[in-house]
Amino acid sequence: MNQSQRKTLSGLVAQLDTIKDAINDMATEEQDKYDNLSEGLQQSDNGQKFEVNASTLNDAVSELESVINNLGEVE
């Protein structure tokens, strides 16, 4: 990989990291919404949606971390 390609890859990794951070913030917000509900409301459809959304977003963050780590191994 030449210098220009490494620079491009570095920029892409930085963009992915920014996206990962934004998704992580969204996951935290969804989890906070769920946590701030009473126990009864946590069991409601909306409460369950908050919990599922947080979990799905956290899964996406984990996948992006894996992609970022893999790209970091490219020489």
Residue ranges, per PLM feature:
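Long, low-complexity or tandemly repetitive, helically biased scaffold regions used
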Residues: 1-75
